[in-house]
């Protein structure tokens, strides 16, 4: 009996203790957890075209990280994607959640606007949303064995030209615009008439000499550096970057060529979803600082700040018949007249396919 009483008391005490512990652990998990430390890191997703990759990775992103740390005490990291401008714009529209779109041409940003992802007026600042300029140039082999100086030099029957595909590369659209505009400029200078037929004619004659079409401007340059082709349509900044890297990459600036204006915009739907609007807005503003514009200039881009452009005027001469997209009617007209299904580019492409003179994609 004595042992029974002892065992009963022990069981009662054990039950009481278990109930006590159960009572202590009955609160919700969030009530038990220690308060979360305040976040000290921001992350931005940058979706850019291929050509400014070095400028961003080596100069601009590290500079902004240091600036943001000093200003806020917070660390900012970047997820980066670099593909052809058109492909990048389509990826963003299809679900790639870039916070910042840094592309080759305005029309690609407009795609993102039409998709409802950019909702603010991205062209409202003093530079109309453009962060860098460049011009279309012709790269050639060392020593210039073909004597290339201008567009007409690319039309000979024995010359092979490289150019990326306008369906995937913003750069290629600039090159098509440059050729059409240059033909019109020549007509205007020689005949006093801005003749679109002359622009189409020059485009056709040069495109007939295109041997390889890559997906992006960067891939096209890589193909050229493998020894394929006699000349390449490229960006001035791409050629200057190669020179900066110690490579022999001579080029000619045609007398009539187009001013390339490269846009940047934050993607409203994504920055709000990710909670990074403040740092994204600050990053876009940072791209217009003098130090950042100098960094772009170092890597071959023409700065949009006038005072920095003056510092680099010897490096970046202005060709005599430089024109902008406005000379061709602006991007809306260009999209309709040149790159739509019934536009000049597709029309020329169909003609070239019919005559079996269309260029082939690069071998991989």
Report residues per predicted region.
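Bacterial N-terminal signal peptides that target proteins for export
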Residues: 1-12
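Early extracytoplasmic/lumenal segment of secretory-pathway proteins
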Residues: 24-115, 122-125, 235, 364
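Extracytoplasmic
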Residues: 39-41, 73-75, 83, 87, ...
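A conserved helix-loop-strand patch within extracytoplasmic ligand-binding domains
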Residues: 113-185
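Periplasmic-binding protein-like
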Residues: 129-135, 199-207, 214, 245-277, ...
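Ligand-binding pocket segment of bilobal, Venus flytrap-like solute-binding proteins
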Residues: 186-254
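Extracellular/periplasmic juxtamembrane helices and adjacent flexible linkers that interface
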Residues: 271-364
